Structures are given as C-alpha cells and as structure tokens.
C-alpha cells in the first residue's frame, strides 16, 4: 500500500517531537534500581534468575520485568537510554496512528486533515492533563506500561478494524499481556467477556483473533496472579492490613472522589463515553448495555491496587487509553445530528486548534528542557563529589513543576528508596536531598 508523502512527514514530526521529550526526561526512581541491577551484563543466567527472584519475592509481571532488565543496563546506560527513547518515540507514533484508525474504523487514513488535527489536539491535551504522557516517558513506565498499551492498540486494529486473522500474533499478544500487568489482564478479560456475550446474544461469529488472545491472556494471567511475589508486594504496600472486600470497594470509590487530580479526567472520559454509547442509535440497546456495563465495571479491577498503594496516574494509564479511544470512537461515529454538527463545527475551527496544539507542544518542550537543564547541573555536582571521593553528598532536589509532570526525585530522607537507588547507581553510600534556594 502506497503511503502518502504528507503522512510520512507527519510521522517523522511526531516521532521527532516525542524523541526530544523522551531525551529530555532524565532517569528517575525505579530507573536507577533497574539499571544498577545490570542483570543482562552479568549473563543470561543472572538475567533469568533476577526475573525468577522477582516472581517469587516481588511481582509476577514476567514479560514487563524481562523487558526492563533487557533494555536498562548501567554498563551500557547511554545505549540503553537511547534505545528506550527511540522505541518509545516510535511507540508514540504507532499509538497515535492506530488509535486514530480504531477511532475512525478505517485501514487507511490521511494525517494531513482537519479530522486528524482535532484528534491529535485532544490526544495531546487530555493525555498531558492526565499525566499519561509524563508517566510514559519515564523509562520504567514506558517499558512496563506504554509498550503494552501500544501492542494492544495494534492488536485491536489488526483483529477488529482490519479483520485480518493471525492466530500466532493473537496468542503472543495474549500471553505477553497476561504476564505483563494484572490491571491490563483484568480490563482485557472483562472487555473480551462482554464481546463474547454480545456476539452470542446477537448470534454473530466470534473473531478468532480475540478468542485466541483471550485464552492466552487468561493462561498468562493465571501465571501472573499466582506469583508469590504479588502477595509479598501487596502485603508490604498495605503494611499487612487486611480489610473486607466491601471496605476495599468503599476505599476505591473514596479515592476516585477525593483524588480529582488523578481521576477527574479519566472519569469524565468514561462518563462521556457512556453517554455517547447509550445515545448512539448505530448500536443496539442490548450491545450498549453489555459494553457500557463492562467498561464501567472495569474500574473495579483497581480495588486491590487502591487498598495496597493508592490510586495514581501510573495505574490509571490503561484506563486513560481505553476511555479516550472509546470516547473518540463514539464521537466520530455517532448517529445524532448534534454530534455530527459539533464535529463539523470543530473542523471549521481547525486553525484555532492548530495554534492551541503548537502552544501545548511548546509548553511541554519548555518544561522538559528546564528539567533537563536542572539534571545537567546536578550531574556536574555528582561528578565533583565522585572525583573528591565524597560518599554521602547533599544534592538539590528538582522543584515541582506541576502535578502532570513526573518528578519522583530523591528526597530529604536518605533511607528512601529513590535515594538508595540513586546512591547505588552513582556509587555513593548515602544521598541527601535538599530544596533549591
């Protein structure tokens, strides 16, 4: 299939912009711990032992752990970071492209268009405001969350929009996601069950790709959930506190209500999605009910997460992606004249959205450039302390730019995990953080 020159140019621009943002985002938090482990450099036996140890003592996310230990190495840190940045930038483009194709339900789209401009504006605006972009350019979250989200988008496009049967890709994707993240597994299983129920009641044939994906995802999910490390981690995070299922549900709802900085936009996208689904005459009432209930109930997958280490932007990433795609898909394929007129009206204001989009991208680049400059300044201090063999330096902490910028820096507590990982990575005994000024 011939690809238009404008599509290629826009693809290059998207990849280039996100590569710059990824490049400006420094290593943070778990990045140092993963890189310091240097599992791959120590040989494949140590590499696999590390994954097995994690399975027993910390997490069953085998595929996610395997990827991060493969791609993040202290010995080859510059190459590692470059590869992650490059792959992540391409993933951004692929996610933008395939999510747009899913939304428009087309196999061929023109990126140099008013429709795509409006879509990309809301993509950047909503994913920036939710902290989605900030989190997935963090190296660890890129590998352990965003790459999986991108894979799911590609799988859905191939299986549903393109309707191309590929059993091996379906099995691979299902098993990979099954071993990737328990929240992803829960959401995927709920949505698949809703699809199967709707197809059965409508007496329609079940897509074999989705069937094989579901089977593989369930098998992988069982292996993941059975990991002893999951319960060690959850017990550690919750300080050994045991509460009833009802109280866990109440806790989840309470956190959704009381943490609007993290939950407001995803919940609004969910609400808009449900309104559009139930008012779309192109969807039967039966299908609307089944899929609406499934989408809303997927939130309750977060119940044990909320109990153990609270809701945060990172655990909501899959919901940001799913709710956004559903909302935009309904918006672009709605039956009512009101929605159609609204879309045409937005298209007529495309030049306004272009200006706003450029302003958003410039704001993002400016903020991350400030973070980059701070990190370079602190690196000079680190080099100075290393050269003078100072084992317990006091280093400045980066100021909080906004809630939607991922910081997770060292703290004033030298025993905090972030400080310990940072110290080990740079060869210090202890690291103390202090506020600038």
Stretch-by-stretch model annotation:
Residues 7, 109-119, 166-167, 206-214, ...:
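Membrane-interfacial loop-to-transmembrane alpha-helix junctions, especially the N-terminal start
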Residues 22-73, 77-81, 86, 139, ...:
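Transmembrane catalytic cores of multi-pass membrane glycosyltransferases
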Residues 91-99, 103, 148-160, 189-197, ...:
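Transmembrane alpha-helical segments
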Residues 112-159, 261-266, 299-330:
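Membrane-interface micro-motifs in multi-pass membrane enzymes
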Residues 166-167, 334-360:
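Signature aromatic-anchored transmembrane alpha helix within multi-pass, membrane-resident enzymes
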């Amino acid at each position: 299939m011939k690809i238009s020159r404008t599509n290629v140019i826009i693809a290059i621009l998207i990849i280039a912009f996100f590569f710059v943002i990824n490049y400006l985002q420094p290593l943070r938090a778990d990045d140092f711990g993963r890189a310091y482990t240097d599992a791959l450099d120590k040989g494949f036996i140590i590499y696999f032992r590390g994954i097995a140890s994690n399975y027993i003592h910390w997490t069953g996310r085998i595929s996610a752990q395997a990827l991060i230990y493969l791609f993040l190495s202290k010995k080859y840190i510059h190459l590692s970071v470059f590869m992650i940045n490059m792959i992540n930038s391409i993933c951004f483009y692929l996610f933008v492209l395939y999510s747009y194709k899913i939304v428009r339900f087309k196999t061929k789209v023109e990126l140099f268009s008013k429709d795509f401009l409006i879509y990309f504006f809301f993509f950047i605006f909503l994913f920036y405001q939710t902290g989605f972009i900030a989190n997935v350019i963090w190296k660890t979250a890129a590998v352990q969350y965003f790459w999986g989200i991108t894979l799911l988008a590609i799988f859905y496009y191939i299986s549903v929009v393109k309707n191309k049967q590929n059993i091996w890709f379906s099995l691979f994707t299902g098993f990979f996601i099954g071993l990737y993240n328990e929240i992803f597994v829960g959401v995927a299983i709920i949505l698949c069950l809703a699809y199967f129920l709707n197809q059965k009641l409508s007496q329609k044939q079940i897509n074999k790709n989705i069937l094989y994906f579901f089977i593989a995802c369930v098998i992988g999910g069982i292996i993941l959930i059975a990991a002893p490390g999951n319960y060690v981690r959850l017990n550690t995070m919750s300080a050994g506190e045991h509460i009833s299922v009802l109280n866990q549900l109440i806790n989840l709802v309470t956190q959704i209500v009381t943490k609007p900085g993290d939950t407001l936009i995803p919940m609004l996208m969910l609400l808009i999605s449900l309104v559009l689904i139930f008012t779309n005459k192109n969807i039967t009432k039966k299908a609307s009910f089944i899929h609406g209930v499934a989408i809303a109930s997927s939130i309750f997958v977060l119940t044990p997460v909320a109990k153990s280490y609270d809701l945060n932007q990172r655990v909501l990433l899959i919901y940001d992606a799913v709710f956004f795609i559903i909302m935009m898909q309904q918006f672009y394929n709605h039956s009512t004249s009101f929605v159609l007129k609204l879309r045409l009206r937005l298209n007529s204001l495309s030049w306004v959205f272009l200006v706003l989009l450029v302003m958003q991208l410039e704001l993002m680049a400016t903020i991350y450039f400030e973070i980059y400059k701070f990190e370079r300044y602190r690196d000079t201090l680190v080099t100075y302390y290393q050269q003078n063999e100072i084992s317990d330096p006091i280093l400045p902490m980066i100021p909080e730019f906004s809630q939607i910028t991922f910081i997770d820096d060292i703290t004033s507590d030298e025993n905090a995990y972030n400080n310990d990982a940072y110290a080990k990575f740079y060869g210090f005994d202890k690291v103390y953080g202090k506020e600038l000024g």
